[in-house]
Curated annotation (Swiss-Prot):
The gene coding this protein: yitH
GO-annotated molecular function: acyltransferase activity, transferring groups other than amino-acyl groups
EC number: 2.3.1.-
Enzyme class: transferase
PROSITE patterns (UniProt xref): GNAT (PS51186)
Family label: Belongs to the acetyltransferase family.
This protein's name: Uncharacterized N-acetyltransferase YitH
InterPro entries named among the record's database cross-references: Acyl/Acetyltrans_Enzymes, Acyl_CoA_acyltransferase, GNAT_dom, YitH/HolE_GNAT
Length: 282
């Protein structure tokens, strides 16, 4: 096949090629703006053919002691040439041995990742909704709109829940979000937050950080209030109590891909991560 045998770094000028690959992979939530943000926040690599077309890509997102690998795509015309394996191995070499590496695998990619040294450590449940029903249980948590002075406490809550420092990414996401909601307890302490972002395909909820599934459901209801059209949320599978609340709110489960970590290294998390930014970013 006419592949240029050099893994190159991808930049903003390659976004159109990334957009084509995402379309081919059936990932409609990644539009031009979403991909530009990801390229700015992460390290992207890929292969070209001799015509200069991007025929594969991979994203590496560094969050301190936790790294995410995502958007691993190989053009269907160039599969089974070992490009995916070479891209994954290249990303692994970009991190040190003390860093946990996570990724969300497709069924097709799972054997590749397992051969590279990844192991399954849970799963992500993808939910969608076309007719939202508000969560009616009353709670003591107070919900307010985000203000700049909340950012320090928000990032501290996110670090404890996610296990990696996403402060730079969160600054960009909050600026691009439809809404950012803060949850506080009766003492006024920040105990959680949630974001909604409009993608080309859905109104997406995430990340959502909360001390309980009830507070997470309350944040989702606030973010969805008055909104129309398709909605999506991706939650870690261990939060089974939120599953029932999502069903009551009109969501249904579409898929449950596995989460993998490299060489049994996993971050320290406090269990408060109720929804991901995306499967690529965690």
């Amino acid at each position: 096949m006419d592949v240029v045998d050099e893994l190159i770094k991808l930049h903003e000028e390659h976004v159109s090629g990334l957009l084509r690959l995402c379309g081919q992979a059936g990932w409609p939530d990644y539009g031009e703006q979403e991909l530009k943000l990801l390229v700015q926040q992460g390290r992207f690599f890929g292969y070209q053919n001799v015509s200069g077309d991007i025929i594969s890509c991979i994203g590496l997102f560094l969050f301190g002691r936790l790294t995410s690998i995502g958007l691993v795509i190989v053009d269907k015309e160039y599969q089974r040439l070992g490009l995916g394996r070479r891209m994954v191995n290249a990303c692994i070499t970009q991190t040190d041995e003390n860093t946990a590496i996570r990724l969300c695998a497709t069924k097709e990619g799972l054997p590749l990742y397992e051969k590279a040294g990844f192991h399954t450590a849970g799963s992500v449940r993808k939910y969608s909704c076309h007719s939202f029903q508000p969560y009616t249980k009353k709670l003591d948590a107070e919900l307010t709109s985000f203000r700049e002075q909340d950012f320090h406490d928000l990032t501290a809550a996110d670090l404890a829940a996610f296990g990696g420092d996403r402060s730079n990414l969160l600054q960009q996401l909050i600026s691009a979000s439809c809404e950012c909601i803060i949850a506080r307890n009766q003492d006024g302490q920040l105990i959680g937050y949630g974001l909604s972002v409009q993608t080309p395909a859905n109104l997406k909820f995430g990340p959502i950080i909360a001390p309980s599934s009830d507070v997470a459901a309350q944040i989702i209801t606030r973010l969805a209030a008055g909104k129309q059209g398709p909605m999506r949320i991706d939650i870690p599978s261990e939060h089974t109590s939120l599953h029932d609340s999502l069903i009551e709110m009109g969501f249904h489960k579409d898929d449950e891909p596995p989460i993998l970590f490299y060489q049994k290294k996993a971050p320290i998390q406090n269990g408060h991560l109720y929804a991901l930014i995306s499967q690529a970013l965690g």
